[in-house]
């Protein structure tokens, strides 16, 4: 996949209709947005286009709508964006997304003005990458901008289809930043390159482990998936999470790491509990073995130090997935220590979206990282070495 894509700064947008695919898939409670990260992430691109005289048309999906659904309207987003930008963002209420109301709102736009279209998933064709809806979207635009990394792994009308019917398709600042940090970390890292993988399941990360073993100097494994690896090494794991059908795969990966000269770090002690509950008593094991009747819920203190030391020696660190059940106070220290080591490091530190992004922000280390990816599934596919259709579809430099 080529990372050298044209950006909004490579095109003259003055007087042009610019359709921007944003990621406004935000959590709503009673019509109020409860997490504004994604809105804030979109502001630099919107401001640039508006300040340079573009007629700005924003679009996005919200939730899993399968047709018009008043509970999934983007109206609250238009209202909040207006407040954040300090200028009106008109809302084109339109169940067909590109109906008469939307066309009229776009036709009336003056240079620098902004309108937000209704949820693209109000059209069931959106997810089918259907030509007719793609053409409808393209008919509103002279220039198309994709700034939604979170949906770049999906070939939908608003991310891929539309690019077939416009001549100019470029990326916004958010995607440019993702390509710069995630792209260079994976394709051209400053070494030593350390990747940290956590989360519950080996099966979710199989392709990531496979791909990263070709690229990293050190691979660190924590979280629920570590217990399948410990089992593969012959340790007892008590009642810990185990994917029995992945033990052989874990053995293969341990052998592959050895053959490639990659340091594979696994827990050397664990913090365990009798039950999966926030108030279960936390017990630290002597070594990697977990006694019968207990389940691993976090990496132990020796492991925390081992992992933190590996991070301290790195020049590039990519992290995807927590080290333990960080939602439980007693079992959050492993995740906290890894985040702290990354925050204190002068390496390029990239957080690969999803749970790790939530953990890092929750622990207050967000602003100490070089880059926090805005895509969960998209970052994972990126780390797997897959092409992302929404990025492939943009013009190369």
Swiss-Prot record:
Q: What is this protein identified as? A: Phosphoglycerate kinase
Q: Which residues bind ATP?
A: 205, 296, 327, 353-356
Q: Which UniProt keywords apply?
A: ATP-binding, Cytoplasm, Glycolysis, Kinase, Nucleotide-binding, Transferase
Q: In which pathway does it act?
A: Carbohydrate degradation; glycolysis; pyruvate from D-glyceraldehyde 3-phosphate: step 2/5
Under SUPFAM superfamilies, the record lists: Phosphoglycerate kinase (SSF53748)
Share an example GO biological-process annotation for this protein: glycolytic process
Q: Which reaction is this enzyme known to catalyze?
A: (2R)-3-phosphoglycerate + ATP = (2R)-3-phospho-glyceroyl phosphate + ADP
Tell me which EC number(s) this protein carries.
2.7.2.3
Organism domain of life: Bacteria
Family membership: Belongs to the phosphoglycerate kinase family.
For this UniProt entry, the molecular function terms from Gene Ontology, in alphabetical order, are: ADP binding; ATP binding; phosphoglycerate kinase activity
HAMAP family assigned to the protein according to its UniProt record, in alphabetical order: Phosphoglyc_kinase
Q: Which InterPro entries match?
A: Phosphoglycerate_kinase, Phosphoglycerate_kinase_CS, Phosphoglycerate_kinase_N, Phosphoglycerate_kinase_sf
Q: Which residues are substrate-binding?
A: 23-25, 38, 61-64, 121, 154
Q: Tell where it localizes.
A: Cytoplasm
Q: Name one GO cellular component term.
A: cytosol
Species for this entry: Clostridium acetobutylicum (strain ATCC 824 / DSM 792 / JCM 1419 / IAM 19013 / LMG 5710 / NBRC 13948 / NRRL B-527 / VKM B-1787 / 2291 / W)
Keyword Kinase set for record: yes
Oligomeric state and partners?
A: Monomer.
Q: Does the keyword Ligase apply?
A: no
